[in-house]
């Protein structure tokens, strides 16, 4: 999952 490019998930990536 590439959550690092989306919203709040990017904060902990």
From Swiss-Prot:
The lineage of its organism: Eukaryota, Metazoa, Spiralia, Lophotrochozoa, Mollusca. Alpha-conotoxins act on postsynaptic membranes, they bind to the nicotinic acetylcholine receptors (nAChR) and thus inhibit them. GO terms for cellular component: extracellular region; host cell postsynaptic membrane. Disulfide bonds join 3-9, 4-13. Expressed by the venom duct. This is Alpha-conotoxin-like Br1.4. The cysteine framework is I (CC-C-C). Alpha4/3 pattern. The keyword Secreted applies. Keywords: Acetylcholine receptor inhibiting toxin, Disulfide bond, Ion channel impairing toxin, Neurotoxin, Postsynaptic neurotoxin, Secreted, Toxin. The keyword Secreted applies. It is found in: Secreted. Belongs to the conotoxin A superfamily. One of its GO terms (molecular function) is ion channel regulator activity. It comes from Conus brunneus.
